[in-house]
Amino acid sequence: YKVRGQERGMDAQKAMSVYRIVQESLNNVIRHAEAKHAWVELDFTDSEVFVQIRDDGKGFVVPANPAEFPEKGHFGLLGLQERAEIINAELKILSTTGQGTIITLQVR
């Protein structure tokens, strides 16, 4: 993992949501990605925290709309999206078949 910037605290609900999003993302890497490597990066600025979880696994086709996650069997991804929305954070999931997945979280 890598941390950039000055670490700073955040309220308990945000901190727990960020922790759970990272935890579920890494669980997905272990369970589904068939990855050799995974990386977690945290970037602290004065007003935001950026979190990136990335792997070199098999990747997948990301549905255009998060509401489609359950239809495609991606219940964990729906949970990530819901947790991000609760804390007014922005979550992006990028993946390419055969090239891995990148999950980014922007917390204000």
Predicted segments, located by residue:
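Coiled-coil dimerization/phosphotransfer module
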Residues: 1-108
